[in-house]
Amino acid sequence: MKKKISSLSKSEDFRNILKGKKLANRYFTIFFKKLVNKKNKELNMSIVTKKKLGNAVKRNKIKRRLKNIMNLAIKKININYNYSYLMIAKKTVLEDEYNNIKQTIFTDFQRIK
């Protein structure tokens, strides 16, 4: 069964997650907060890129790259679906290799329990 990533859409959801816990590394910052009274079959996650990272082409490349890695992570590791996640990208995502970013995401999401 393929797991799906659902995007956060309401600004209230973003504000709520920003009040939760935070995990940072050189590529991105992950904010996460436990969902109350929900058993999700979908992963609630959004990827945010700031305008200072570059033009729309670069920002969309970062988002595509991180979404692709997250789809791989869903298949390979046990991600906790009882949390909502907000991933804010940093400029080093564009500069470093795909495999380094992938390994970092895998280890970070295994740490979140």
Give residue spans per PLM region.
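Positively charged, solvent-exposed patches that mediate nucleic-acid binding
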Residues: 1-113
